[in-house]
C-alpha cells in the first residue's frame, strides 16, 4: 500500500479553520484572523471610510477571503464547506467592522447567505450599527 497523500487535509472536521489559518499565515501583510472564520485586512482603513464586508461558505479557498485587502474587501465571514456562516458570526463581524462611515454588506444571492445577512442586519440595526446591504446576482455554479 502506498503512503502517498492525495489531499492537503489534516482533519475534515477542522478544514475551514485550518484553511483560513494557513491563508493568514501565508499572507500576513494582507490579512489576519479577527475571530473564528472572520478574515480582516491586516492594515485596517480609517473609521471615515465605509467598511466592505461579505460572507459565504468555504470550499473554494481562498474564495471571498482572497479579496480581503487594500482597495478591496475589509472583511470576509466564512461558513463551513458549502454552507453560509450563521447570522451570529456575521453579526460578530459587523460589530468588529462598525465605524462612523458605516458598512456595505455584499451578499451573494444564495439562500443561506441571504437569510444570515437579513438576520445579522436586524441585530445590527438594534445596536445602532449602520449597514447597507447589496444583494448580488447568483453565479451560475449551481446549474440551471
Model-identified regions with their sequence ranges:
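Gly-rich Lys/Arg/Thr-decorated short loops/hinges at beta-loop-alpha junctions or inter-strand turns
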Residues: 1-4, 46-55, 64-77, 142
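Glycine-rich oxoanion-binding loops at beta->alpha junctions
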Residues: 60, 64-100, 138
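A glycine- and small-aliphatic-rich helix-loop capping segment at beta-alpha/alpha-beta transitions
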Residues: 67-75, 120-130
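Active-site histidine-anchored catalytic micro-motif
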Residues: 98-100, 112-116, 128-144
